Amino acid sequence: MILRLFSYQRLFLAKGLFFSFLFLFIASFALADEFDDLFSDVETKEASPEKKSLWRDLLNNSNFKFTLRSMTQYENPSPRKGLDDKSQFVDGRLNYDTKLKRGMNLLSLAMWFEYGNQKDTYKGIGDFPEDRDDHRRIVEFNEFNWVGSWDNFDLTIGKKVFKMGISTLYSPSDRISPKDFNDPLNPKELGTWLSQIDVFKGDTTFTFAVIPFFTPLKRPPTNSRWSGTGESSNSIESLIPNNLPSSTSVEEFPDRTLENIQALLRVKTTVKGWDFFLAAFHGPNFFPVLAANSPINFRTEQVRVGNYSIGFSTTYKKFEFHGEALYQLAYASKDDNYLNYVFGSTLTMDKRVKRIGLEQIDLTAEFSKEKITAKQTHSDFVVSSEESRAARDIILTRIIFKYSENLRMAAGFNFDFDERGHFETAGFEYKMAPGLIFKMHTEFINGKKDTHYGQFRENDRLVTALEYSF
């Protein structure tokens, strides 16, 4: 009882700190306006700029987007206890973002309200400072940060989505911001709390960031159609050997200690039309591994690793070329050491296609491969993160047909050479009026049971969406 009371106190304290942080930021901008008024009569009267209103600027910089989505499943799933076996799912989301600029200070906020009829999927507001619950949040403060800008550097403090990679369809380096995989074919990028400094020198940017809290990936609930054979993808249960008569498991996350702080360093530059980046990361692994407490007792851990990545992009005539590679070094051999790389290109056709009534065609293709250089060998760990790493030997393609500013069609195809699984999608979007877009696409997934694509093979569906931006 005492422990429970203590945990509640910590929760209230954390949420109190968050809202205090919000209040102080807004109050500081408001007070800045008042101090301007205080010294107004000692300033030169030659210039009398219009007084800035904090609330008017927030409103003028506000953007809203409401999305209503419908998902119709083509087939019934295999029956199991508690399964959410509906064939029609609906959800709605209202996105809101705004910015406030005062001198060298920039305050940014991005959030959304979301709900749907998926069973056991939505719940409350995200936990502070890290959200370790798999539920999608009804209210999600995804980004809330302050940026201070000086002549040759920026300082960022707060919550934001951090993009690392450079590739178009798949980036092995994008492992900083957590992701919501409640719907694996429609994932969401989530913000993470960090302190970041960007130093600018000519065409080169040096970035150093510290991320004090670890937030894991969000996975589908066990009663979801997207949990495959009955357990969440990337969960402990999916990693436990099938030949055990019975077992128990616990899920462990990194403690809030200095040892588990995440840190990254990145250098981005442009040289004669070539964009490059080089990065190093230290912290808990993006993917979990399985450790054994006893022959029938298991736990997952996000073990500490070093990730070292490099990437490039350039253009030549109608072609864009890009590539990146990540090498993971698992400390104490608690996971695999491996190299994951991707190379790809986008071809843009905008002249000859006008003969067939099109404005433009964009064709993108990428190939991703993984090479394990050292297997997991630590005696306490029994399963590596290999099965959680989806892009080990895969080709990804996408083609976009632009008929006009109002109508676009697209198709995509992925094929996994390692597991012989595949994914196809095709659809269109039509701009019905300024700010109003109708979208429709279909998705087909297939592969052997217990493979990345195969676990979703009963989830072919038709997705329609109506988006209104204002």
Model-derived regions, located:
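N-terminal periplasmic/intermembrane-space "pro-region" immediately following the signal or transit peptide
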Residues: A30-G103, T205
